[in-house]
Amino acid sequence: MTKDQQNIERGSVINVEILNAAHGGQGIAKYDGRVIFVKGAFPGDRLSANITHVKKKFARATIASIEMPSPLRMQQRCLAAANGAGCCDFGEFDPEIEGRYKADLVLEQLERLGKVSQPPTCEVVSFGSPTQWRTRMRLGVDAQGRAGGFASQSREVVSGVPCSQGVMGLLDGIVGAEQNVLRFTPGSQVVVVCDDLGQRTVVETQPAPRGKRTESMVKVVEGTGKVSQVVDGVTFELPATGFWQSHKDAAQAYADTIREWFGSLIIRNTDSSLVAWDLYGGCGSFASAILSAVDNHGVVHCVESAPAAVSAGKRALSQLVEDQKIVFHTETVERAMNQLPAPTLVVLDPPRVGAGAETVRAIAQSGPQAAIHIGCDPATFARDIAEWSRNGFILEKLRVFDAFPGTHHCETIGLLTKKN
């Protein structure tokens, strides 16, 4: 260990050049043998970094000042982020190459964590405008009752300036000049949604108490508290606080990918005995795509632990439920799998933490011919893919969606097939 390394401690400021990108919106620098992960830094930045955490072989830092910006860095396109909100950490990134940049990070995670030495060609899907794409936002409320985004790595509320992600009209009268906006209960949260029918809903909620998972909706400020979302011509009516894809075009794009990929396979049994699993399936927004990919043969078992989502799915897909083409199970994936008939096809869309090795192993050992795995975190997606590989599956297709432009996040979808 060098003398310089011994002197690095929390609060130290060092000058570095960012050499590579790291998962999670970080840049990588080297400083006297240590790897330095700098939050919000882009390859090519020369900057002063404020050390926040120190380990033997690496340290973490934030940007103190940028001495020479990377060619990738442009003017911040989000006023909220420019004022300290944590919404658009990639708001300064060149949007023309943002999707490819994220795809390269996915490939790096697949190689390093997923042990995929020869990944398939990675398709990149960008949805056009880098702003005005988000249909739902969760806002904090400050002591004066003003709504706004949360500051980066903080619960402090940045009010008065709207985030550029919101679709047209989403935050009108909610976030903006003080004299023109509604006031809310201090300490509450505000959920604002503009649904697929163009209707805006605004609800005030109280965060869930410590140890509880479900928040309480305390006041409907605008609309009915319900939102209507459309996929494959089916309208799902959900609580405003329920889960739905953030990007206005994402849900349909993912359903189209499922239909395309499963439709291209040669399925060994396409009679009425075909079984598909739709795991972490929400309201069943992908179930119609799965069925249409196999010409409506067989049955889709949709597993979801949230009762409100299951109820919404049963209402929206009532005819298919009545015909027993779609069967909903209000249960966790881990508990439901032992009760389901063996699948031919599987779709799984786990939360950000991933499905995990034990769950992937159980799905793989249930004997599907193919699976479509969806992930919103490159690292956990890669770890799940590694477990698929250990259980005899190969990653055949890969598609990265820049579904969260202006942020370091992306959505990744992979097609896995059983090795011969």
UniProtKB/Swiss-Prot annotation:
GO terms for molecular function: rRNA (uridine-C5-)-methyltransferase activity. It is an enzyme of class 2 (transferase). Keywords: Methyltransferase, S-adenosyl-L-methionine, Transferase. The keyword Methyltransferase applies. It comes from the Bacteria. Residues 7-65 form the TRAM domain. Its EC number is 2.1.1.-. The active site is at C376 (nucleophile). GO terms for biological process: rRNA base methylation. Pfam families: TRAM, tRNA_U5-meth_tr. The keyword S-adenosyl-L-methionine applies. SUPFAM superfamilies: Nucleic acid-binding proteins (SSF50249), S-adenosyl-L-methionine-dependent methyltransferases (SSF53335). S-adenosyl-L-methionine binds at Q245, Y280, E304, D349. InterPro entries: MeTrfase_TrmA_AS, NA-bd_OB-fold, SAM-dependent_MTases_sf, TRAM_dom, U5_MeTrfase_fam. Belongs to the class I-like SAM-binding methyltransferase superfamily. RNA M5U methyltransferase family. PANTHER family: RNA M5U METHYLTRANSFERASE (PTHR11061), TRNA (URACIL(54)-C(5))-METHYLTRANSFERASE (PTHR11061:SF30). This is Uncharacterized RNA methyltransferase DIP1398. The lineage of its organism: Bacteria, Bacillati, Actinomycetota, Actinomycetes, Mycobacteriales.
